[in-house]
């Protein structure tokens, strides 16, 4: 069985994708999103909403961090799944204390599950570059 945080990331990715495609406000999108799914544990729902709202709140910084390392790739040219996997992961890298390796591994798995054949490798490459720019203590180095 997958962890609550893993399930929350999956739901957060799905909600971010829906928001990206529908271009609607976050509150309306989340309300509609939760109505379209089987009920989930309150903790999973709360974690997912926290991630979605965090990405939305810090979207400019998140997008800038992605674009700074995405050579020859503008965000608007990326596949929607890849773009939102990256947004979710970069938010976690920049704004949470979740271990860097965990964030990257979970993002790669989301890319493989929901993206194209090359999504996992693409996500890995971008996130490795973002992570290399983090302070050593954040990367788990001494």
Swiss-Prot record:
One of its GO terms (biological process) is DNA-templated transcription termination. It comes from the Bacteria. It holds the Pfam family NusB. The keyword Iron does not apply. GO terms for cellular component: cytosol. One of its GO terms (molecular function) is RNA binding. Gene3D superfamilies: NusB-like. InterPro entries: NusB-like_sf (IPR035926), NusB_fam (IPR011605), NusB_RsmB_TIM44 (IPR006027). Keywords: RNA-binding, Transcription, Transcription antitermination, Transcription regulation. Involved in transcription antitermination. Required for transcription of ribosomal RNA (rRNA) genes. Binds specifically to the boxA antiterminator sequence of the ribosomal RNA (rrn) operons. Belongs to the NusB family. HAMAP family: NusB. This is Transcription antitermination protein NusB. It comes from Anaeromyxobacter dehalogenans (strain 2CP-C). The gene is nusB.
